[in-house]
């Protein structure tokens, strides 16, 4: 096939009238974002998911949710698995607000410690607590009680 015969193909996702677009999600994390947002498969909302879409910086995921704006707690959880994500609020088909997620230096009650012997996993009324660091691509959590580190599959340990 000659270069003249090649066609540029685009992946097109219909724009949303009102809602949220979460862009620049780390490739492969879109389904964890849906888990964080607790969107059931039986939802009447239109949800569009792009996984491993080409990007200037490699690959990314994108999630579009019609008719819903995220709360602060949801955005904070998304930041743990997608530290470079942007949250775009769409109103009347236009971006009305655009924010970059921010990772807090400490989180409480958001992630379960992976150490089964940690005090936060006992029957005691102790809330999980982690120190958070990030290098831009990877988030690292250190339990404040047992100092166990979580850096892989953080989405699997969200409460």
Swiss-Prot record:
Contains catalytic and regulatory chains. This is Aspartate carbamoyltransferase regulatory chain. One of its GO terms (biological process) is pyrimidine nucleotide biosynthetic process. InterPro entries: Asp_carbamoyltransf_reg_N, Asp_carbamoylTrfase_reg, Asp_carbamoyltrfase_reg_C, Asp_carbatrfase_reg_C_sf, Asp_carbatrfase_reg_N_sf. GO terms for cellular component: aspartate carbamoyltransferase complex. Keywords: Metal-binding, Pyrimidine biosynthesis, Zinc. Its cofactor is Zn(2+). One of its GO terms (molecular function) is metal ion binding. Belongs to the PyrI family. Zn(2+) binds at residues 113, 118, 143, 146. The keyword Acetylation does not apply. Involved in allosteric regulation of aspartate carbamoyltransferase. The lineage of its organism: Archaea, Methanobacteriati, Methanobacteriota, Stenosarchaea group, Methanomicrobia. HAMAP family: Asp_carb_tr_reg. It comes from Methanococcoides burtonii (strain DSM 6242 / NBRC 107633 / OCM 468 / ACE-M). Binds 1 zinc ion per subunit.
């Amino acid at each position: 096939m000659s270069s003249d015969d090649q066609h540029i193909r685009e992946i097109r996702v219909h724009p949303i009238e009102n809602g949220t677009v979460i862009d620049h999600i780390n490739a492969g994390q879109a389904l964890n974002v849906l888990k964080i947002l607790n969107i059931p498969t039986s939802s009447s909302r239109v949800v569009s998911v792009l996984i491993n879409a080409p990007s200037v910086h490699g690959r990314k995921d994108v999630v579009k949710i019609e008719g819903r704006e995220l709360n602060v707690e949801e955005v904070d959880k998304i930041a743990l698995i997608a530290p470079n994500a942007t949250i775009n609020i769409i109103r009347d088909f236009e971006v009305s607000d655009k924010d970059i997620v921010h990772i807090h230096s400490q989180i409480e009650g958001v992630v379960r410690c992976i150490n089964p012997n940690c005090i936060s996993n006992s029957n005691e009324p102790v809330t999980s607590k982690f120190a958070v660091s990030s290098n831009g691509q990877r988030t690292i959590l250190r339990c404040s009680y047992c100092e166990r580190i979580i850096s892989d599959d953080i989405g699997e340990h969200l409460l």
